[in-house]
Amino acid sequence: MTELKAKGPRAPHVAGGPPSPEVGSPLLCRPAAGPFQGSQTSDTLPEVSAIPISLDGLLFPRPCQGQDPLDEKTQDQQSLSDVEGAYSRAEATRGTGGSSSRPPEKDSGLLHSVLDTLLAPSGPGQSQPSPPACEVTSSWCLFGPELPEDPPAAPATQGVLSPLMSRSGCKAGDSSGTAAAHKVLPRGLSPSRQLLLPASGSPHWSGAPVKPSPQPAAVEVEEEDGSESEESAGPLLKGKPRALGGAAAGGGAAAVPPGAAAGGVALVPKEDSRFSAPRVALVEQDAPMAPGRSPLATTTMDFTHVPILPLSHALLAARTRQLLEEESYDGGAGAASAFAPPRSSPSASSTPVAVGDFPDCAYPPDADPKDDAYPLYGDFQPPALKIKEEEEGAEVSARSPRSYLVAGANPAAFPDFPLGPPPPLPPRAPPSRPGEAAVTAAPAGASVSSASSSGSTLECILYKAEGAPPQQGPFAPPPCKAPGAGGCLLPRDGLPSTSASAAAAGAAPALYPALGLNGLPQLGYQAAVLKEGLQQVYPPYLNYLRPDSEASQSPQYSFESLPQKICLICGDEASGCHYGVLTCGSCKVFFKRAMEGQHNYLCAGRNDCIVDKIRRKNCPACRLRKCCQAGMVLGGRKFKKFNKVRVMRALDAVALPQPVGIPNESQALSQRFTFPPGQDIQLIPPLINLLVSIEPDVIYAGHDNSKPDTSSSLLTSLNQLGERQLLSVVKWSKLLPGFRNLHIDDQITLIQYSWMSLMVFGLGWRSYKHVSGQMLYFAPDLILNEQRMKESSFYSLCLTMWQIPQEFVKLQVSQEEFLCMKVLLLLNTIPLEGLRSQTQFEEMRSSYIRELIKAIGLRQKGVVSSSQRFYQLTKLLDNLHDLVKQLHLYCLNTFIQSRALSVEFPEMMSEVIAAQLPKILAGMVKPLLFHKK
């Protein structure tokens, strides 16, 4: 920026030509009031030239004849108060061709020529009569034409201000002598409100070979007395607001300080950024800097008092229609380029904008916003900003009835900005404004995973609270909407993200308080999670960790504690493996005497006495019960060599004290304790007891057997039964030990992949138990014998399903074996890319395989027979993959032709079929086989 060194005289003017300021002077920089009060002249300096005296009354309004001249401060205040009505009065004066009572001055010919030049329309060769230089009823002497009605057309400042920025000494190659300026679009503003700033280092006048700009803007800065601009990129000029009369005001161009040219920053008034033009908000000189905004946005400056003229309704409507019809606002580069061009580049492209630069034009809302206070971020807001607005929370929506953008970075508009996992948000109510639901929901599908896109209903059920919900941590699942209110509104992006940034930060935190397979949480979490009265099982499946509350009651088992040789009954130092369990000598002798003496011990308390080194002799009933639960049997092999594998096998038989509330516990214990000494005692492992207790109740199909069977009615009844069984599977999985330790997406994926296997496996078990495999026992009210199978339209499918109960009859599967195999079916199919909680999944699956081995050992004696039994049962699980694949294919074909076949499919079942069955049939899942084919 050229330094203002002196104030020279007015440059000579050629009659009939445009005004010609000297090279190096600012465009409309107003000098001090001294040179304008007299006609004295001085030597002309080459660097700075003042504005011609003939333009003094034009560019800076003077009082008309008959009025006392006011001081500059009073005149400024009057000008500001007349901003609202100045535009209409000037237009009325121009339209009626009104005249002023002021007599023409001595240079009236020159003034008329300048006015004709200034008021000339944008087309060449057109002119119009000059309005009067001054009017008594208004402090504004000149206004330009209205804003154009057509949005693509150039603003009115193009034709009004171009002659002002021209020189008489222009080169022939220059076009109208316009200044070279780059377009800098403030963030959040449409192109129709863009400002023009000269780039740093570029010539300010048309004498240099620069590219003409189609929209030059009039710039005027009022400096304080005695202040000089030392640097072109220095601080912004500060001063009091002052009204600008003349063509600059008429053009409606926003004022830009000269210091902003180097930085490339265009500042606009606060209300201008929201298109709320009728209200003029002036920045006070000592206003504090707003948090989250750039210093340039809060620096006090002289806005040169450009009147904020109202936009044309046609222009605003066209811009609104353009924003609504554009297809590039989907979070990509188009959104970044349209709303936030970089400051340093004159050509706003798709370059991502820095986060700190975004809030310059996104001002925080007013304390009491009006209904029309935020039209920019209202109904015609692009979807990229809509997503951000939907996530702002209930507080923001309660303060303002209209949506607006809070100052800050918009992650939807800046895809390259690394974001951590967003905190989960509660489900939002449906939008109140028409058309908002479609705009908000459309781009949300891009961030939804394949498993979760169709699992909204499953997720609602998984999140459904039963009794007192577990304590929610920082990543606890948000509550879902009430059942029966339609689809689940829970946003999938409310879950912890698995993006690269989240992976770099570390492993994703658990969604739930981590539960072990024994129903107990890990250390540091509260324990009441499973249903009341369920048995607690032994802890080997969670690295042998127990809650803090039981740390003093019993030892904590881990590999570090193995060398201590701890007794698994009382926690004392173990002397060896006695009767099959690692125990101390005291517990060994106690168990032998109790079993051989046939003592009938009774607990004086509630069968939950603490058994440790100090209190192990207080209650012999609880001590003997703990010995039996640990797996101590008379005649067990003794070994004194502490091998890790053998110790782990011994630790697998450890059990915690059972809680109160299990029915017939005392009777069962008394029966066990009165066995003869030579009889072998076989105790069911506690985890299998837990699986028995959480087994779902009987489910009815609701089929009307009084009417003759038709294909559509039979298939519809089977679908209704499948919907109820799917709900039962979800509830059962929530109670399954270890399942809720997995990621919520993994839980939904496993249920969606295995629901058909679980249903047909349960069908085989019911058919085997109730009708000995002679019929298909779907439900108590829907049993198909062979005759009804032949009459149905899916007889071949019934024959396929009939193979399962026949295998059960052949193998004589026990209930314990069935329950363990059922859990393994839930864990038998995973995605090709694996699960998010793959490590926890593998540990859980290995644990239930060990439980199956224990269930086999309850009936089979000997290693050979147990191994053969394990092979037969696992081979049956492998063969189920091919059988279920046929069911998947038939189910998908029926679902596609459901209208033609008049078959009804319930909502949740339809979601799973439409989303997952094509993926399963296409081989996009990985079956986990026990044996190679």
Swiss-Prot record:
Covalent link Glycyl lysine isopeptide (Lys-Gly) (interchain with G-Cter in SUMO), residues: 388, 531
Stretches for region Mediates transcriptional transrepression: 165-305
Subcellular location: Nucleus; Cytoplasm
DNA-binding region: 567-639
Region feature (AF3): 1-164
Source superkingdom: Eukaryota
UniProt-annotated stretches for the region Modulating, Pro-Rich: 1-566
Sites of Phosphoserine modification: 20, 81, 130, 162, 190, 213, 294, 345, 400
Biased composition (Pro residues): 418-433
Biased composition annotated in UniProt, kind: Low complexity: 232-246, 335-350, 434-452
GO cellular component, one term: cytoplasm
Chain location of the short sequence motif LXXL motif 1 per the record: 55-59
NR LBD domain segment(s): 679-913
Residue ranges of the motif LXXL motif 2: 115-119
UniProt-recorded Gene Ontology molecular function terms: nuclear steroid receptor activity; sequence-specific DNA binding; steroid binding; zinc ion binding
The keyword Cytoplasm appears for this protein: yes
Compositionally skewed regions (Acidic residues) per UniProt: 220-231
Full protein name: Progesterone receptor
Species, as recorded: Papio anubis (Olive baboon)
Lineage: Eukaryota, Metazoa, Chordata, Craniata, Vertebrata
Name of encoding gene: PGR
